[in-house]
Amino acid sequence: DIGSRKVVADIDWECEVHHNYQEKNYGCDPSEYMAQKWAFSLSDKCIVLEDDDVPAVSFFGFCKELLDKYEHDTRISMIAGFNNEEITPDITSDYFFATTFSIWGWASWRRVTDQWDEFYTFLDDKENMRQLKNLIHTRRYRKDFIYMCQRHREHGKAYYETIFHASMLFNSGLSIVPTRNMINNLGATADSTHFAG
């Protein structure tokens, strides 16, 4: 919208700015998928924030350090900024590894987004589906995940969140989660579009 474009136009610190304005409103999905694929086509490392994510200033340094440290470690798929426990007790380091993640502020590499299956073709492969069902059961992951992927494919839209999770599951990917939460989500209220309290 016009307000968002004005914010970008008013950036006053030294940096290179790239614009990718859609001529048509596609809605959240597939717009987020399209924007992320575009951003990762320009850079091999990116930090992704949605319009309602408010990061702590330390989030950027946290991402920069870990993007560099784990750049060539293919076990790591993403760096999360959100920790839903706010503070994770009994962990002495600044972060820990997990098999799931939140999309409320994250960073990753092109090598990861290159693995994304925009068309959900894994749904047509019996061996992939057997593995996916086993992973969902073993890791106690969302029981409705396969159903969500099927619905997203039926809608003909690339929903990056399910695509990203499927990619992590199939590639045994890990996320890095900060011991202390670094993201406040202004859209996480009872009357929000994508959030139910």
Regions found by a protein language model. Name each.
Residues 1-48, 53-197:
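An acidic/histidine-cluster motif and surrounding catalytic segment
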